Amino acid sequence: MHDDPTCGHAPGPILPAEVVARFEREAIRGVCDTGRYLMPYFTWGQGPPLVFVHGAADTAMSFRPVIARLSAHFRCIAYTLPQGHDDGARLWGYHHADLVEDLWALFAHLGLERAYVLGSSFGSTVALAAMRQHPERIPRAILQGGTAYRPLRFLERVLTFGLRFFPGKMAKLRRRERLLARIHRPCFEGLPEEVYRAFVDWTGEARLAALGHQARWLHGIDLRADLPAIRQPVLLLHGERDSVMPRRHADALLAGLGSAGLVVLEGAGHVPQYTHPEMLAGVIRQFLTPPGAAPAVPDCAATCTNPQAGCLGPASPACDGRVPLPVSGRREP
């Protein structure tokens, strides 16, 4: 860990204005009727499909900086979780399982038999549940700032559960910018001011009520018992300076999943899609291979660091190895 609060960044950033301009030129927007809400989504790029699931107090637009760097390699698909405003979602009757069904509805809408999935923060719980439910449809996944079990502390429950009754956007929340500055601003140091303003403004579009319900769903979900049954290769990404989802959550996923590896994003916090999009895109690009060439249980000799006799894959009982991650940055066993 670095004592210096300034975070390191890769050179040559694409500034938010350019990201937005490219998004408007190149991305295709759509709406998927899941039967529970009208899901807004966009697709951007060509190649193997990669679906992005965002975290709490966020929208699909947060992934634009990293997707701008991946669109030449993947058909990137990002969607916004139910917000309960003009999308028809009845959040009071929603359950975490419904979020997973919404993901499958998007698969059906886009004609996806298989796709990679990246789940960020709260979105990682949706990705994990989907991988457990239909492993044949998600051959590999990436969990950034993820968790399988994150019950809220009493004060967190008090502060978030009450938001379920509030209309309006996150941008209207009192003292929001002060809170964001305390938690996230250090990892934007050294970057142009417009990058931080994009983070504040784009996340401000999420709905207050949606955050309240997302907090309730997160508090009630416990996927730890399902982890050993998730046999697909999983890349865990943890920001070195992430105080929102501390390292213990990544370690628990690493210990519980059948075939996972951990990469620590040096200098990053909880929102590397804003602060370190070049690094994040590079790690994603190197980990993933086309779904048609990546069976759900890959060949052990090609993927394990310690292949054993009789091993049929990283998840088989005879295999003691883990999936090696051909990525830059700091890799940890």
Question: What are the residue ranges of the model-derived segments?
Answer:
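Active-site loop/oxyanion-hole signature of alpha/beta-hydrolase fold enzymes
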Residues: 77-118, 282
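Catalytic histidine-centered segment of alpha/beta-hydrolase-like enzymes
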Residues: 268-281
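Short beta-strand/loop motif that positions the catalytic acidic residue
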Residues: 230, 236-238, 242
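Conserved alpha/beta-hydrolase catalytic His-Asp/Glu region
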Residues: 152-154, 172-228
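Alpha/beta-hydrolase fold catalytic core
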Residues: 1-50, 73-74, 112, 288-311, ...
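Conserved alpha/beta-hydrolase "acid-adjacent" motif
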Residues: 243-249
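Flexible "cap/lid" loop of the alpha/beta hydrolase fold
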Residues: 128, 132, 139-169
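Conserved HGGG/HGGXW glycine-rich cap/lid loop of the alpha/beta-hydrolase fold
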Residues: 37-89
